[in-house]
Structures are given as structure tokens and as C-alpha cells.
Amino acid sequence: MNINATLIGQAIWFALFVFFCMKFVWPPISRALDERKQKIAEGLSAADRAERDLELAQEKATANLKESKEKAAEIIDQANRRANQIVEEAKDAARAEGERLIAKAHSEIDQEVNQAREQLRKDVAVLALSGAEKVLGGEVNQDKHTQLLEQLAAEL
């Protein structure tokens, strides 16, 4: 191989070209590559953070949903217990009212029976005196009449 001036010139120009590229072209390209690399790393990091945040949000949502379901079940149970309590109170009140009405009716019946008996005693006494008066043919005096009425009432 012949080394001539052209080859030496080309080698010098190539060395100058490499130096020029290393000095002026390579730093901006390297900087652009580093920036791109950093942006990609930040994007991946942000994606990882977003994925973790999503998982945490899903866990919180699941926990909140579970808690809400438990509270709803508790509220429903409490409402059912209260409804049953109200029904029982209404039944007890109705029972007590019925018993009170029955007792009142019994009391009124007893009063009416006693009044009827008393009236019957008076009527029987009057009839007995009037019958006795007719049988005896004369009138019994008022004191004896009252005394006989009281005695008959006591006997009846």
C-alpha cells in the first residue's frame, strides 16, 4: 500500500472532522439523548407512582364500600328492630286498651245488674205491700210500711 499525500490529507481531514464532531456536534446530541433518557425514566417513574396510587385508591374504595355496606346493614337491622319494637308496643297498647274496655264493660254490666236488682227489690216490695194491703183489707201505716220495705229489701 502506498501512502501518498491524498491519504494523509484525507486522514487529517477525517481527524479534523472527528474533532469538530466531538467538539460541536456530539455534545448537543449527547445532551438530547440524556434529556430523552431522563424524560423516559421520569415517565416510567410517574407510571409506577400512578399504578401504586391507583392500587391504593382501589383499596380505599373497596374498604369504603365494605364499610358502607356494613353501616347500611346495621341501619337496616336497627330499623327492623325499631319496627318490631313499635309493632310490639302497638300490640301491647291495643291489648291494654282492650282489657280496659272489657273491664269497663264488666263494671257497667255489674252496675246495671245491681241497679236492676235494686229496682226489682223495690218493685217486689211495693207489689208485696199492695197485695198484703188488699188481703188485709186495710192500709198499713207509713212507719210500718217503711219498716216492712226495708226488711223485705234486706231479705231479698
From Swiss-Prot:
UniProt keyword Cell membrane, yes or no: yes
Assembly notes? F-type ATPases have 2 components, F(1) - the catalytic core - and F(0) - the membrane proton channel. F(1) has five subunits: alpha(3), beta(3), gamma(1), delta(1), epsilon(1). F(0) has three main subunits: a(1), b(2) and c(10-14). The alpha and beta chains form an alternating ring which encloses part of the gamma chain. F(1) is attached to F(0) by a central stalk formed by the gamma and epsilon chains, while a peripheral stalk is formed by the delta and b chains.
Q: Which GO terms describe its molecular function?
A: proton-transporting ATP synthase activity, rotational mechanism; proton-transporting ATPase activity, rotational mechanism
Tell me the membrane topology, using the record's own terms.
Single-pass membrane protein
Q: Which UniProt keywords are given for this protein, alphabetically ordered?
A: ATP synthesis, Cell inner membrane, Cell membrane, CF(0), Hydrogen ion transport, Ion transport, Membrane, Transmembrane, Transmembrane helix, Transport
Give the protein's biological function. F(1)F(0) ATP synthase produces ATP from ADP in the presence of a proton or sodium gradient. F-type ATPases consist of two structural domains, F(1) containing the extramembraneous catalytic core and F(0) containing the membrane proton channel, linked together by a central stalk and a peripheral stalk. During catalysis, ATP synthesis in the catalytic domain of F(1) is coupled via a rotary mechanism of the central stalk subunits to proton translocation.
Gene that produces this protein: atpF
Q: Which Gene3D superfamilies match?
A: F1F0 ATP synthase subunit B, membrane domain
Q: What is this protein called?
A: ATP synthase subunit b
The family database entries (SUPFAM superfamilies) matched by this protein are listed as: F1F0 ATP synthase subunit B, membrane domain (SSF81573)
Keyword Ribonucleoprotein present in the record's keywords: the answer is no
Any one cellular component term from GO for this entry?
A: plasma membrane
Q: Which family does it belong to?
A: Belongs to the ATPase B chain family.
Q: Which residues cross the membrane?
A: 7-27
- Show the taxonomic lineage: Bacteria, Pseudomonadati, Pseudomonadota, Gammaproteobacteria, Oceanospirillales
Q: Which InterPro entries match?
A: ATP_synth_B-like_membr_sf (IPR028987), ATP_synth_b/b'su_bac/chlpt (IPR002146), ATP_synth_F0_bsu_bac (IPR005864), ATP_synthase_B_chain (IPR050059)
